Amino acid sequence: MGALPVAHSLALTAAFLPCRRPAAHGRCRRRRYRAVVAYMEPNPNSPAAIAGRLVGALPIVGLVARILNDEGGVGGDIIDFAEFRRRVSKKCTVMDSKAFYDFNQRRGKPGDPFYVLLCCWLAAIGAGLLKTEEILEGVARLRISNDIEFEEETFIDMMRAAKEKRAKLKAPAPQIPMETRAEKALEAIYVCCFGQDMVEDEDEKLLRAILNAVFPSVGRAAVERMVASMAKQVASGERKRDGRTVSKEVQQRQLKDLEFLKQNKLESS
């Protein structure tokens, strides 16, 4: 694959670079964190979480809080894709950003950092609201349609509808471990970015870096285990036998469904 223009290369990685302020003497200080915690995995019973729900429930105060908070999640709101990207960006190191860029170089358009992050967003935020097959069908459509805006809008509508339905039924939200969410993200990334291709050693290395950046609380050992397991299943053909890949015929049918959904959305607007 040919090298991308420098300007485009910077544009791809800029969204994931951490915000850095030069020190007084002009040199950059390395960012340090006391503990690695998943940014979408708060304790719902913590004082901060309870206070957040109370603030979100107040009409005027909640509105102001939502305006001032660019990371979302105020009062239990669903974190949208843009807010999710900002949260990831603030936790990413330069090496994490490079992993996204290198993965894009290897996989081409389907490996676009935004596509990869959409897969992670659907698994991290949509787990418990979206079915696994809904996520995989959506990212398979994205691979051939390249219409990320439509998929984002479609999925956020589905998540909101599922959340409203759960609220009406007064059903508690399922507690899904972050490791399970990371596994779902890996499944989605494979369907979107690989299709049915083999996962090479360099791909495994980059996938580990990406998942560790997005799901830091899962732990490097667990991430390494799930990536190695998936690569082994792909190499042995196990995923095809289990029906966990999307054939070209299904992809074409999904593309037709996508056009139908777009037309319906235009007519209803």
Swiss-Prot record:
Q: Which InterPro entries match?
A: PSA3
- Disulfide bridge partners, by residue number: none
Q: What happens when the gene is disrupted?
A: Pale green phenotype.
Instruction: Provide the protein's localization.
Output: Plastid, Chloroplast thylakoid membrane
User: What are the protein's UniProt keywords?
Assistant: Chloroplast, Membrane, Plastid, Thylakoid, Transit peptide
Any one GO biological process = photosystem I assembly
Transit sequence range: 1-37
Membrane topology, record value: Peripheral membrane protein
What's any one GO cellular component for it?
Answer: chloroplast thylakoid membrane
Where is the secretion signal located? none
Protein function: Nuclear genome-encoded factor required for the accumulation of photosystem I (PSI). Functions as a PSI biogenesis factor. Cooperates with PYG7 to promote the stable assembly of PSI in the thylakoid membrane. May target primarily the PsaC subunit. Does not seem to be required for the expression of chloroplast genes encoding PSI subunits.
| Designated name of the protein | Photosystem I assembly factor PSA3, chloroplastic
